[in-house]
């Protein structure tokens, strides 16, 4: 059976672990006849063929042609329907050397298995009713998780909280459609139809659906991450802060102006938000053509940032009694939220710090975070402030612990359902014929079905599973 680019039933095999030296490697199989086919390369073929589901065997992988031992392995046996894919399945757990993992995989391919497509195991779990699309997508979320919060969000969807939330809304929407159908079928039977349908019934569905749509805005930054740019004039301390946040010496630190001529990138997280952090060239006019390119890149990256940490040298502010005009204009005109960071805190006394705060307040710039990258003072406060700004910018200070969305695809489907329901609600208030309103309600129900996979197309399935790695 063929669904989109995937077929069902035929035996497939894939390497499920990274191809690099490791303690263990896993080669997995699934499909009709998988147990019998796998027994052809196992030292105890009869035991494997007769093994019960959810059992483990110990033995060797043998090359059927040369009869030579390949590796000592543990074999996990699953019988349909009680497996991840819902099919018979065998997994070989071997030593994790690249050559031995590839050898076992090639032996399986030579003995009747087909190479699996990316995401094909999870697709089969979906097609065989072992998981809906929200759970299938959650599998990929967990694989790609970068922080504990990523894992927590994905685990909630994997456990079925989004599926349950959608099913509850679909149940309520189905009841509204049924109520409208009663009035359509029995317009003159007051005892049967009167009061069965009202616009308020639609409104009661719109509200939780709005909350669900809003959950993506609040959560996507925890899933997709944020782009945080360190900006400021030369020698403001950007590279020192870059190193301090990473807790390693990645960027060259020098008193020479224009040392950083291009951007550096590193990954970290601010209290659970995955961040791509960029150290950029100092912003200044320069006749050095190479440095000028770096400056332009700094400005471009700042325009595309989710958050800018704009660094200022306190000596310049104190000596001038004001913030440099270019710095002030950058902070006030930036498209992204800006946290003003005053560096070299270890060189400032209390009076100087308060003076700087007063100067910035007079120029209507939010209170800065004052740090010392050298002494690590203020770094924690800066990280917490960055988290607060990034989370607030999504419209939430955290994330939903109940049903919540985990992908753009899910958000788009919810928004389409919401748009149709709002139209239906408005039309019902204006007295449109009920049969037209029911058409809108049924369309909304179809959009919600796309989220769980109850309503599906090849395009939807390709969109969901194309991002999966081979072996999952």
Swiss-Prot record:
Coiled coil: none annotated. GTP binds at residues 235-240, 254-260, 279-282. PROSITE patterns: G_TRME. It comes from the Bacteria. Binds 1 potassium ion per subunit. InterPro entries: G_TrmE (IPR031168), GTP-bd (IPR006073), GTP-bd_TrmE_N (IPR018948), GTPase_MnmE (IPR004520), MnmE_dom2 (IPR027368), MnmE_helical (IPR025867), P-loop_NTPase (IPR027417), Small_GTP-bd (IPR005225). GO terms for biological process: tRNA methylation; tRNA wobble uridine modification. Its EC number is 3.6.-.-. SUPFAM superfamilies: P-loop containing nucleoside triphosphate hydrolases. GO terms for molecular function: GTP binding; GTPase activity; metal ion binding. K(+) binds at residues 235, 254, 256, 259. Mg(2+) binds at residues 239, 260. (6S)-5-formyl-5,6,7,8-tetrahydrofolate binds at residues 28, 91, 130, 472. Keywords: Cytoplasm, GTP-binding, Hydrolase, Magnesium, Metal-binding, Nucleotide-binding, Potassium, tRNA processing. It is found in: Cytoplasm. It holds the Pfam family MMR_HSR1. Residues 225-391 form the TrmE-type G domain. Its cofactor is K(+). Gene3D superfamilies: P-loop containing nucleotide triphosphate hydrolases (3.40.50.300), Probable tRNA modification gtpase trme, domain 1 (3.30.1360.120), tRNA modification GTPase MnmE domain 2 (1.20.120.430). Belongs to the TRAFAC class TrmE-Era-EngA-EngB-Septin-like GTPase superfamily. TrmE GTPase family. Homodimer. Heterotetramer of two MnmE and two MnmG subunits. Exhibits a very high intrinsic GTPase hydrolysis rate. Involved in the addition of a carboxymethylaminomethyl (cmnm) group at the wobble position (U34) of certain tRNAs, forming tRNA-cmnm(5)s(2)U34. PANTHER family: TRNA MODIFICATION GTPASE GTPBP3 (PTHR42714), TRNA MODIFICATION GTPASE GTPBP3, MITOCHONDRIAL (PTHR42714:SF2). NCBIfam families: mnmE_trmE_thdF (TIGR00450), small_GTP (TIGR00231). This is tRNA modification GTPase MnmE. It comes from Treponema denticola (strain ATCC 35405 / DSM 14222 / CIP 103919 / JCM 8153 / KCTC 15104).
